[in-house]
Amino acid sequence: MQKKKSLNLLLALMMVFALVLPSIPALAATSSMSVEFYNSNKSAQTNSITPIIKITNTSDSDLNLNDVKVRYYYTSDGTQGQTFWCDHAGALLGNSYVDNTSKVTANFVKETASPTSTYDTYVEFGFASGRATLKKGQFITIQGRITKSDWSNYTQTNDYSFDASSSTPVVNPKVTGYIGGAKVLGTAPGPDVPSSIINPTSATFDKNVTKQADVKTTMTLNGNTFKTITDANGTALNASTDYSVSGNDVTISKAYLAKQSVGTTTLNFNFSAGNPQKLVITVVDTPVEAVTATIGKVQVNAGETVAVPVNLTKVPAAGLATIELPLTFDSASLEVVSITAGDIVLNPSVNFSSTVSGSTIKLLFLDDTLGSQLITKDGVFATITFKAKAITGTTAKVTSVKLAGTPVVGDAQLQEKPCAVNPGTVTINPIDNRMQISVGTATVKAGEIAAVPVTLTSVPSTGIATAEAQVSFDATLLEVASVTAGDIVLNPTVNFSYTVNGNVIKLLFLDDTLGSQLISKDGVFVTINFKAKAVTSTVTTPVTVSGTPVFADGTLAEVQSKTAAGSVTINIGDPILEPTISPVTATFDKKAPADVATTMTLNGYTFNGITGLTTSDYSISGNVVKISQAYLAKQPVGDLTLTFNFSNGNKTATAKLVVSIKDAPKTVTATVGTATVNAGETVAVPVTLSNVSGISTAELQLSFDATLLEVVSITAGDIVLNPSVNFSSVVNGSTIKLLFLDDTLGSQLISKDGVFATINFKAKSVTSTVTTPVKVSGTPVFADGTLAELSYETVAGSVTINAIGPVKTVTATVGTATVKSGETVAVPVTLSNVPGIATAELQLSFDATLLEVASITVGDIVLNPSVNFSSVVNGSTIKLLFLDDTLGSQLISKDGVLATINFKAKTVTSTVTTPVAVSGTPVFADGTLAELQSKTVAGSVTIEPSQPVKTVTATVGTATVKSGETVAVPVTLSNVPGIATAELQVGFDATLLEVASITVGDIVLNPSVNFSSVVNGSTIKLLFLDDTLGSQLISKDGVLATINFKAKTVTSKVTTPVAVSGTPVFADGTLAELNMKTVAGSVTIEPSQPVKTVTATVGTATVKSGETVAVPVTLSNVPGIATAELQVGFDATLLEVASITVGDIVLNPSVNFSSVVNGSTIKLLFLDDTLGSQLISKDGVLATINFKAKTVTSKVTTPVAVSGTPVFADGTLAELKYETVAGSVTIEPSQPVKTVTATVGTATGKVGETVAVPVTLSNVPGIATAEVQVGFDATLLEVASITAGDIVLNPSVNFSSVVNGSTIKILFLDDTLGSQLISKDGVFATINFKIKAVPSTGTTPVAISGTPVFADGTLAEVQYKTVAGSVTIAAADIKAVKATVGTATGKAGDTVAVPVTLSNVSGIATVELQLSFDATLLEVASITAGDIVLNPSVNFSSVVNGSTIKILFLDDTLGSQLISKDGVFATVNFKVKSTATNSAVTPVTVSGTPVFADGTLAELKSESAAGRLTILPTVIIVDSTVAPTAVTFDKANQADAAITMTLNGNTFSAIKNGTATLVKGTDYTVSENVVTISKAYLAKQTGTVTLEFVFDKGNSAKVVVAVKEIQIVNSTITPVVATFEKTAAKQADVVVTMSLNGNTFSAIKNGTTTLVKGTDYTISGSTVTISKAYLATLADGSATLEFVFNQGASAKLRLTIVPAVVDPVVTDFAVKIDKVSAAAGSTVKVPVSLINVSKVGNVCVAEYKISFDSSVLTYVGTTAGTSIKNPAVNFSSQLNGNTITLLFFDNTIGNELITADGQFATIEFKVNAAATSGTTAEVKVATISSFADASLTEITKVATVNGSVKVS
């Protein structure tokens, strides 16, 4: 009772709150903020109203100022425009002050409805985005001024909100505040009208037609009424076309937005009261994504055909209606065989076509329906099948298939789409003449030996000097017995070897003589003798060449090769039982030694011993073999494999025992010794190893102080055997790496303690005694004879260096100089405080943008400079090098100039001083090569400008033109100083102007070479470059270029600027940049003629239902129309388009006109295909639409009108204005409508019988389609069948029915839609019901349910009525249930099924049935319930007892799971006992009295019939066989595999591959006894596949398929070796030609570094050019570049990097021998010259000797040079060994002197044919015998420059 009273009280309180709450003001809102206010200017008359407003957040939650509005009410005192000036707005946010001045907004609202004497205007203050948010207690203060546009006075005393007294912010109730549009404080002067709001207030619209979408916003009206939307100009939007309103939701039409310009569109929402609200829409126009056509890249052999696909991607979802794709190909290399449409092309026979003309292919697509067969997805557009023509040479030819001309792609509206085309290639491979390495085939029995030859064919004439090939085989089937060299291998014991590793054999051949024992003919290379292992059936196993074979010819040039696989077929043969041992693994621990035992199972073999062991190493007891611990203790740690040998007649066998030998390893100690040495002397530091137990490999890294010590040499210690092979060392900076590897991996181990290596250090200079460590750094590596890693420890050493005297500090000083631009100046580099310098390396840096090195001359403190001094200039760096070649006699021994650098100054516009300084760390060493200390002094060069720089003026001209015409706009240059290069960008408005052409001006010389221009959108780029860099400068003022613009259509006169944009670049003849200024131009465009407004009028018509009427669409006020798109809408429920005919104003309509009908819309399209000569030029009918009227019951007029936005354009494709006039069609009914009656008949029958119930139709008007649904009680009736009645014509096509539970759906559709109507009354269908068992009789309804549908011949709906029927069920005669035991046949061991069936079933709830059988012959395997038993796991059970079976059924539900139909009650599965081998018939009978009861558990009558089981005699099963049992499937030459079965009385069942079963009809087919395995299935397999043929009895048969993969031919390169010389004059790109062999080039790698394409190398076709700039960065010596391809092995280019040779700068009189190159076997001439003759005046006598390398060069002869006058008298030469004496003597002693530099002699050599490429043979001056001048005074100072011959 108390609870009920509480509930009543709560309910009463809720009712009170419901009545009271609406009248309570929103306290939370009013308390959310306070607004305080005062006027700072209180003058009665003033030109400025100055409100001060303070807004404070008084609530606990944040106050978003974007939601806040404050209104000030006043009289505007005039109609002038007004402005609010926000002087300051600051928010105090905690301790931070935030300026919001720019965020304050003000909106002036004029009161027009009810102004008062104190108010006709209010200003509403708000905040823009980015404003502050106020937390509790925070405030913002606004200070500002309101003024009129003419600054006239306001009268404030009559203003509603004016406060004349306050001087600080106070609450002013006449100032109102709003949050979220709701007023929260203050009182307004008139009605309190809050502003409406919209959300969102901003949006984005994309003009891209694929992305256009309406823009929506929602209004919160706040009691106001929405009025209009206006744009920024005040123009109202059209409420029916520009936007729509649904409730408070406003949708701005995408059609309206699509007309707006890119940028910002502001729409004002206007309401009945309050402020207008702004919706700001950002309009963008993203580019339409280009449809991409990609032509495939394929390979083909010459003479064969290949398919090249053309794929389309980025197909728009709306689809493509038309495509025209012109392609070009190399018709000299390719021939078009066929072109087929791809799978994305629907109805290709109509929509697709192609043409081939010469080397051009045109692919054409046009959706003939213009809508229903568009290309709508990515995929193959077309496939071009080419036949490759023959090519010459061995290099593959790459030919392109690419775009020719402009592709045309159009969408469903025939709007052009951008299209990009990616070119394809066809690589034609030449006929393959490469050498082939082939593996043979063999057949062998298991256990026997098969010899498999490996042959070489097409051996090159240059022979094979080296070969490395790898052969793979299946080690589970084959074992290598031996490998023998073939007869083409000479001296095989020396030249041939092989290794076997698992399933791989490596074959190695090397002609040890490198020439005299080459493989020079085709034949057997090797024979591999395989021993076949046991198999259970015949199997063929592949033997293949794997990896990439390597062959080189007699010149060691790489020989390309191809491979062919072989196989071994192994037959079962005699059963093989090979001997075995157990166990096959064991462990021996040296710390706990014990014998190792294993037991042999000989299987008829004899044990013959253990390989490598004597009988003392093991013992035998019976079949047990023990390996003695004494033998095992001697073995090294690791796995020891012992081979047990057996024999059986001529058969041999082995078994292997692997013993793991274990022992704790020793710890090796590596000790570095100590030593003491004087600075400049050498000392030996030993590295010793102790506790050595047998070391096979060692890697030891030592570190030392390279500023104190220098490694002179490293020698191996005496514990290292064969050190020239096993020991090596590497010095890198301050690190030494010592490496040891026993090359024999066992016989040359380090086996004792001692010195491992001795390091000989030279001590550098020190100023005081110092001890420096030498120690092991990093992680040492030691391994024993098994390559197991050893532990280690290290002991550090040291070297103590004693100082030998004070060290001087050398000072290197760079001088200073001043020079004018373009002139040369000398800058000396001097050395002071010189102690005696043997070597110096000095690097100078300078600004290469200001200075250029002209030359470098050696200073006078350098002796023998041609030998001892050199210099190198690299960019902005100079390296000066000095080395006393005598290491003592030519030291720099005094202070002075080391070198003078002659700089040429570059152009500057003002004086600049640039430093020249020593960079990096100089290196100086004294005569002992001890390093010297140094310091440097920097220098500089001051550059003064040579002349002032002019300022070039580029002026764009002006012009006037009419729309559609062309006008010339010149671009002139003035104040030209001489211009070598110019780049000028001109911008214009591409919506108004189009570039027709650009012509070069007369001031440009050789314009075809020096001038170019590029037009890109609205930008023109003008480019000039004097190709001669001097002789064709622009040297005078004048026109640079003339731009010819075509003016586009305008409706009013407009002037558009044409101006230089960006930053022009001009440079003079020295490429120094020039100053620039520009003058803009313009083009004024005048309209050519007024634009007409086209009127499109749809006509009207009247028609009767079912008839056709013509509705014309006419055009009037036609100005000349090139394109028109018109959409006509109609009501498709009333009208149907019969046809559309083109009007007479359309010329060439089959090309220019089309139409598309889509639902209730007709699209009429016109496009003058000539774009000019077939315009619509007169008023008249554009098209006539022929409508067929549908059936109506009363007269109706339906509109036919232009919908959407029509598009018209004139002959210039300028859009035309238009207006439309709607039409209509009036439809009158043709005749009255009949009402069809559908009647379901009645029938009577007994349970179990079938009765026919007819469904008849009457009052039939002519029915084309009918759908009738009939309902019945499915618990009482079951549909047996449904047949069509006699009023249904062609029922197999027109009639169908569906039964679903208790519902029948009967369907009729006249497939002809007219000639097979139901036209008379009669039976529509007959339903044959079978009556189910029921407990009592009764009548059940059969009636039409749902809503029938009937339609006449016009498909107009026909009215109907229905009459229900029924089935009366009478009691059935009760028959006895009969239980029948079935019969079966089987043999001993078989399991056979004996069914027990029930018939005359009327609904059984329980069954008990007992069967008897002969238990001496039969055994019950299982008993399963039959399909008439529902829920058998619950309702069914059985019991077997001896020879009796009891079967029980009880419907656990006692009603819903009765046995209700005849069928199998149970199946007894008998197993025939193995003793029943003879023929017999044994009965299986029903014994006792069966018990059956119905659903009421009333007992049913029953009867039974016995069964029997016939036992057949045992039959011997013969296994089925197949032939062949082994096949090879070649993926390169695919074919089905046919297998013949010998069934032997069995039946073929299936084929299995492992656990997978092949699919018949897909993976294979069967024809009688032949099974054909599909090549499509075989192509998916890899390796060896075993297919198991399964039969109904007997064993399965197996077919082994060896799948041969498509051979990948490795790509190759030519050449494979190359030389790059770093000498600047000799640097050249390295060009490599690739033979791709069907592969694709991927990259080039140098180790782990990938070269950069386009920078480090370039590709043109199959040619790769490696940049000399990249090659110059490689380290001197050798380098290997790896060419990587998408498949197959990479190819390697081995490079020899020759260091730069810096010829010394020779300033003295000298003999100079040139350096030349020549090929092996060729002759070469070496010039010998005299230079700097002026230094000695003249030469009268010259005698000197030249030596040469006779191992490379053979002397041919010498001829006098051009410097020799009268050579027959004055010149002679003589050869003595490898020395040539040259003699000159002016016999006149004065008249035939040598007075100038020139060629003294030419020596001719022949390069030995055997000389190796890259070898350099020295040709040098051996002795200077005598030189004298005209006074016969001896010339004592003669320098020499030696030469050489390099073998190329």
Swiss-Prot record:
Highest taxon listed in the record's lineage: Bacteria
Pfam families from the UniProt entry: CBM_3 (PF00942), CBM_X2 (PF03442), Cohesin (PF00963)
Post-translational modification: The N-terminus is blocked.
InterPro entries, per the entry: Carbo-bd_X2, CBM2/CBM3_carb-bd_dom_sf, CBM3, CBM3_sf, Cohesin_dom, Ig-like_fold, Ig_E-set
Protein location: Secreted
MF terms in GO: cellulose binding
Biological processes per GO annotation: cell wall organization; cellulose catabolic process
Keywords, alphabetical: Carbohydrate metabolism, Cell wall biogenesis/degradation, Cellulose degradation, Glycoprotein, Polysaccharide degradation, Repeat, Secreted, Signal
Chief location: secreted
Residue ranges of every copy of the Cohesin domain listed in the record: 291-428, 435-570, 668-801, 810-943, 952-1085, 1094-1227, 1236-1369, 1377-1511, 1709-1847
One GO CC annotation: extracellular region
Function: Binds to cellulose fibers and coordinates cellulase enzymes.
Protein name: Cellulose-binding protein A
Annotated source species: Clostridium cellulovorans
Organismal lineage: Bacteria, Bacillati, Bacillota, Clostridia, Eubacteriales
